[in-house]
Amino acid sequence: MKFGKRLKKQVEESLPEWRDKFLAYKRLKKLVRLVSSSSGDVGGGGGGEAEFVRLLDGEVDRINAFFLEQEEEFVIRQRELQETVEKVAGGGGGGRRPAAAEMRRVRKEIVDLHGEMVLLLNYSAVNYTGLAKILKKYDKRTGRLLRLPFIEKVLRQPFFTTELISRLVRDCEATMEAIFTSSVATTAMAGDRRTWKGCSGDAGMAPMADQQGIFRNTVAALATMKELRSGSSTYGRFSLPPMAAPASPESDVLQSIRSDPHLKENGRIPSLQFFYA
């Protein structure tokens, strides 16, 4: 699949409020097409190249701003969620068992946060790859060597530095594993399974229709990151994002969510519908 189509697919599968935050690849590609390798202006490194670099710099600044904003939000949410998990696990300090609704809410928040952080890792990977691809096209068309110095600059950009988000994802997965398998959670949810099985019609289907998207998008993002890092012969040494790979779509933590017995209804496993009930 060509990168332009892959990017379009990723934008469509991303969160609605993120869709205008991705690299303006189509606009950059259009500008590259207007550039002629025989143009004295561009060949001399004049206005044509300056315009292209200005657009690239603007895109990098925009991507950085969004990435840093989301990263800061996730740090805060992760800290608050950990405090909530500890409170629920301890029965709020009063020795009581957490209610099923309370445990569902915590599970939902964990899954949402994990999914959104994986989407941010994917956002970094896709935008980095887009920059590398468009610079490769530019150099090929103009005969210039802009890609190497520009990518070296990109390597120092905040959106390219994903160690913090990768660590938050791993921490979140550890919390997910603990909360999904704890005896406290199992006890809290046991009675609620009977209530869930009694749901039918619109009341039973609404949670699935409203909330299953985050899990689907997360798995799609993981698959894309795996593809981008697969070492395709069309990619150069700068084309792979240097991130610590999060869980794969087949990872234990994601499979444990999908295979949770609470999710099984009429022989199928609706994505996360129980946790969003």
Curated annotation (Swiss-Prot):
Q: Which UniProt keywords apply?
A: Cytoplasm, Nucleus
Residue ranges annotated as transmembrane are none
Where in this chain does the record put each SPX domain? 1-152
Q: Which InterPro entries match?
A: SPX_dom (IPR004331), SPX_prot (IPR031142)
| Alphabetical list of CDD domains matching this protein | SPX_AtSPX1_like (cd14481)
Q: Where in the cell is it found?
A: Nucleus; Cytoplasm
On whether Nucleus is a keyword of this UniProt record, the answer is yes
**Superkingdom of this protein's organism:** Eukaryota
**Any idea what a deletion of this gene does?**
No visible phenotype, due to the redundancy with SPX5.
Q: What induces it?
A: Up-regulated under phosphate starvation. Up-regulated during cold stress.
Give the record's GO CC terms.
cytoplasm; nucleus
- Role played: Functional repressor of PHR2. Involved in maintaining cellular Pi homeostasis when plants are exposed to an external change in Pi. Negatively regulates root-to-shoot Pi translocation redundantly with SPX3. Down-regulates the non-coding RNA IPS1 (At3g09922) and suppresses the responses of miR399 and PHO2 to Pi-starvation.
Q: What is this protein called?
A: SPX domain-containing protein 3
Q: What is the lineage of its organism?
A: Eukaryota, Viridiplantae, Streptophyta, Embryophyta, Tracheophyta
